[in-house]
Each structure stands twice: as structure tokens, then as C-alpha cells.
Amino acid sequence: MRSGLGWRSLNPVEAVADVHSIENKDTLFRIAYEARNPEARRLALLKMGDKRLMAAFAQSDCSPIVRRLMVRELDDIALVRHIAENDDDRSVRESAAQRLAQLERESAGQI
């Protein structure tokens, strides 16, 4: 049963379904900063495609889920290395280490 809260809902199914229907960048920006559900924040960030915002959320979102998923979108080797070495959450550090290895292979022309 839907609560009618849309992207403000704590229910991930409801929140994400609402974000899928939104295209307005200003609304997506608001969702990225205000949604209580990490999956809604993550999807809003992906839909906006702003690498600077993704980098900011990869470093500072309160949810390891968002940080882990945003680090996978980053292309800045130094930033990804910093997150791999310093994030408080092991899963975020592991995700950053995997992304770092991928970026290093790509920069060496192995992919």
C-alpha cells in the first residue's frame, strides 16, 4: 500500500517509483538532498548525471549505500583512491578499491 509520500517515503519501492517519473533537474536536485530513502537519493543523482554532485555524495552522504554506489560512477583516480583509503565503511572502501583498479586498467589501456 502506497503512503502517498512519493519520493519522501521511507518505502524504497514507493520512493524510487516516484523518482523514476521525475525529469525536472531542480526537483531531482532537491530529492538528492532531501529524500529520506537512500535509494531515492541515489537514483536522483544518477538521473542528473552531474559528476561533481556524485563526487560530493560519494564522500559525504550519511548512507554507505549512496556512497558505495556513487563511487562506482567516479572517474577521478585521486578521489577514488582517497575514498578507498579513508571511508569509514568497509563496503565503501571495497567498492572504491574495485573502481580504482578498473580506472587504473583503463588508463593503462588494458580495457
Predicted regions and their residues:
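Alpha-helical scaffold segments
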Residues: 1-111
